[in-house]
Curated annotation (Swiss-Prot):
One of the GO BP terms on file: fatty acid biosynthetic process
Keywords: ATP-binding, Cytoplasm, Fatty acid biosynthesis, Fatty acid metabolism, Lipid biosynthesis, Lipid metabolism, Metal-binding, Nucleotide-binding, Transferase, Zinc, Zinc-finger
Gene name per UniProt: accD
General function of this protein: Component of the acetyl coenzyme A carboxylase (ACC) complex. Biotin carboxylase (BC) catalyzes the carboxylation of biotin on its carrier protein (BCCP) and then the CO(2) group is transferred by the transcarboxylase to acetyl-CoA to form malonyl-CoA.
Name of the protein described by the UniProt record: Acetyl-coenzyme A carboxylase carboxyl transferase subunit beta
Segments forming C4-type zinc fingers: 28-50
Domain CoA carboxyltransferase N-terminal: 24-280
PANTHER family: ACETYL-COENZYME A CARBOXYLASE CARBOXYL TRANSFERASE SUBUNIT BETA, CHLOROPLASTIC
Gene Ontology MF annotations: acetyl-CoA carboxylase activity; ATP binding; carboxyl- or carbamoyltransferase activity; zinc ion binding
Catalytic activity: N(6)-carboxybiotinyl-L-lysyl-[protein] + acetyl-CoA = N(6)-biotinyl-L-lysyl-[protein] + malonyl-CoA
Length: 280
């Protein structure tokens, strides 16, 4: 082997190591420690040093809560359509394609069916990685069908919100989903079916103003940003500085807007206990 070939080989080895290292480690946003991703996943994406909770995708959330999964998505054939031919800096069609390739999902929600320990449930899990978890026609349609499935089987319905709000690319159609999901929850209530709403970071806009705050029991993960408009928008509007921790889960608990703040490690057990005590 010549000197040039040897040097090229060393460069290739170095490049492959860099790729492996870049994909294997992540920095904690809070304490800035470097974490091994495999260990982080085993710890429910909670930093072992400071307890900071990284955002989970929809499937990770299902895996963290359900012991047995009958279906990760009961309605996989429902797909988004560019109803109004929306275009900003990109066409909506292109944004959808990019999000689908990035996440492997059709849209920002999956409706899972499975067991938490020995209790059968329906779990609506949102994915912030899909266009900011924005709610459009598909999110609304799948959510409603999930509720109908829970009513049909007389089993608890759980939603895990992670969203920036309504999807602007669908205009008024996205806003319609607020009423649509709220009406579905009303049917769930009339059927006497338990609805537990879990709010994660972030739960904002049209999602917070609809199904996310309609739970019989509302749980939030620690330090989650929860509200309608963001804090910067509010400060600019009222021209006042907001209180420390405003719109964080602990602040909302103190003001009586949610029922409890539960650490991710205790979330499954807490939900199970609530189901046992309220759903027979």
């Amino acid at each position: 082997m010549g000197l040039k070939d040897f040097v090229d080989k060393l460069k290739n080895i170095k490049k492959s190591r860099i790729k492996i290292e870049e994909g294997a480690w992540i920095k904690c946003d809070k304490c800035k420690n470097i974490l091994y991703i495999e260990d982080l996943l085993k710890n429910l994406k909670i930093c072992p040093h400071c307890g900071y909770t990284f955002r989970m995708n929809a499937k990770e959330r299902v895996d963290s809560l359900l012991d047995k999964v009958y279906s990760y998505d009961l309605f996989p054939k429902i797909k988004p359509v560019d109803i109004i031919g929306f275009k900003d800096t990109k066409r909506y069609k292109d944004r959808l394609k990019e999000a689908q390739e990035k996440t492997g999902l059709n849209d920002a929600i999956i409706i899972a069916h499975g067991n938490i320990y020995d209790r059968e449930v329906v779990l609506a899990s949102m994915d912030f990685n899909f266009m900011g978890g924005s709610m459009g026609s598909v999110v609304g349609a799948k959510f409603v069908r999930g509720v109908e499935f829970a009513i049909e089987k007389s089993i608890p319905f759980i939603s895990v919100a992670a969203s920036g709000g309504a999807r602007m690319q669908e205009s008024i159609v996205s806003l319609m989903q607020m009423a649509k999901t709220a009406i579905a929850i009303d049917r769930l209530n009339k059927a006497g079916i338990l609805y537990i709403s879990v709010l994660t970071d972030p739960t904002m806009g049209g999602v917070s103003a609809s199904f996310a705050f309609l739970g019989d029991i509302i749980i939030a993960e620690p330090e989650s940003l929860i509200g309608f408009a963001g804090p910067r928008v509010i400060e600019q509007t009222i021209r006042q500085q907001l209180p420390e921790g405003f719109q964080r889960a602990e602040f909302l608990l103190e003001k009586g807007q949610i029922d409890m703040v539960v650490d991710r490690k205790n979330l499954k057990k807490t939900i199970y206990t609530l189901i046992r005590h309220t759903h027979g």
